[in-house]
Amino acid sequence: MAEVSLGMLIDIVDEEWMRDTLPDDDLPLPPVLAVKTDDTEETNQETQQADAETWRDLALDTQ
């Protein structure tokens, strides 16, 4: 439900739409984005590689 400025409530979606769900998609992730589930010791090389590709420009100097 959503409230209009006059205080009336309107239906945005119907009951069938509210019960509907999206299917779970099994999408393959690149190895860099895959979640590591094991507790083995690994080098920090993969983390550093991902950090090197991170965009850091916040454009704070522009107006």
UniProtKB/Swiss-Prot annotation:
Signal peptide: none annotated. InterPro entries: Apc13. Pathway: Protein modification; protein ubiquitination. Residues 36-63 are annotated as: Disordered. GO terms for biological process: cell division; inflorescence development; miRNA transcription; phyllome development; pollen maturation; protein ubiquitination. Residues 53-63 have a biased composition (Basic and acidic residues). It is found in: Nucleus. Keywords: Cell cycle, Cell division, Developmental protein, Mitosis, Nucleus, Ubl conjugation pathway. Disruption phenotype: Abnormalities in shoot and inflorescence development leading to the 'bonsai' phenotype characterized by short, compact inflorescence, resulting in reduced plant height, disrupted phyllotaxis, reduced apical dominance and production of clusters of bracts and flowers at the apex of the inflorescence. Reduced seed set mostly due to impaired pollen maturation and thus abnormal male transmission. Defects in mature miRNA miR159 accumulation. Induction: Regulated by epigenetic histone methylation on H3K9me in a KYP and CMT3-dependent manner. GO terms for cellular component: anaphase-promoting complex. Belongs to the APC13 family. Component of the anaphase promoting complex/cyclosome (APC/C) complex. This is Anaphase-promoting complex subunit 13.
